[in-house]
Amino acid sequence: MDVLRNNQAGLSGLAQLQALMVANSPPPINETMGFVLIEIEEGRAVFEGNPDRSVYNPIGSVHGGYAATLLDSACGCAVHSKLAADQGYTTLELKVAYHRPLTEASGPVRAEGRILSIGRRAAFAEATLTDRDGRLCASATSTLLVFPLERPATTA
């Protein structure tokens, strides 16, 4: 997804994320970590992933960073879905609680993010990560900065 191009086209955050899903063109982080955006609506985003041994830590379970990345993506895209074409966001803080370990047998896993509140400069979101049986594996709260996107200079 080329956010800058979509911004120039005047697409809202929700329209940008919907276009990403239709084009089946995930950002590189999704390919690297093996997860995909499967649902998007205003204020809500759902990702699905299949953790495998490539994301294991030294003790034989999925590294916490995998769960944190999914939760951060779910929170961020929930916020992105409510932004105008001329707005961007970035995570300021992510607090993750790990409830149970993940292994490759846990998948597919599902991260669902929701907006708690959004203002002109800050947004607050939460997300849950559940395993194939619907058990809570991790949860997160996030504070995100909302900012205006600069328009690229046009050439004459």
Regions found by a protein language model. Name each.
Residues 1-156:
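Terminal targeting signals and extreme-terminal segments of soluble enzymes
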